[in-house]
Amino acid sequence: MMLSDNDIIKEIDSGGLVIEPFNKEFVGPCSYDITLGDEFIVYTDEVYDLKKELNHNKFKIENSIMVCPLCYELDDEKIEYFKNKYGVDVVVKGGLLGTTTEFVELPNDICAQYQGRSSFGRVFLQSHQTAGWIDAGFKGKITLEIVAYDKPVILYKNQRIGQLIFSKTLTPANIGYCDRKGSKYGGQNSVNASLIHKDEI
């Protein structure tokens, strides 16, 4: 059962569902808008070897970041040009990981799905790739997988970037995500790189 605006507010008021910070104006008919945080990760490896821990740079922004498509020609001169002209803190090319401002805590009978806002889709900016599902019992900030496909896009800290859609399960999960053995991302309060190298093969 998908939660409506009334259901979301009731769950927040009862303490079953936690969104911190919570803004009542971000509640949609059956969704909740979440915002872009200030922490990001860019991978530095030549190849993604998924049996090994991936090298990466983690950084914060004060205000804004420019995301350029992978095929975009970008050198130091162009980066400085963009910074000076548009006042962005950082210019990156290719995919990067971001995080939400909000810390979300789901009870064992509510799961969620992340969707990018349609306004971003209309400028060919995708904020998640395959990781839109959030299991019941999860708590933490939501990691975003951000890619620009057409022109460079400027993103701003605290900008509404996506939405969470909540569903109620028929019965509570016996073991929620954060209590499940082998869960990798429970309780995360920051952007985290892939931990797929910890999988048993």
Curated annotation (Swiss-Prot):
Active site positions, chain numbering: E145 (proton donor/acceptor)
Binding site for dCTP: R117, S118, S119, F120, G121, R122, D135, T143, L144, E145, Q163, Y177, Q188
Any single Pfam family the record assigns to this protein: DCD
Protein's pathway: Pyrimidine metabolism; dUMP biosynthesis; dUMP from dCTP: step 1/1
Job of this protein: Bifunctional enzyme that catalyzes both the deamination of dCTP to dUTP and the hydrolysis of dUTP to dUMP without releasing the toxic dUTP intermediate.
Organism of derivation: Methanococcus aeolicus (strain ATCC BAA-1280 / DSM 17508 / OCM 812 / Nankai-3)
InterPro entries for the chain: dCTP_deaminase, dUTPase-like_sf, dUTPase_trimeric
UniProt protein name: dCTP deaminase, dUMP-forming
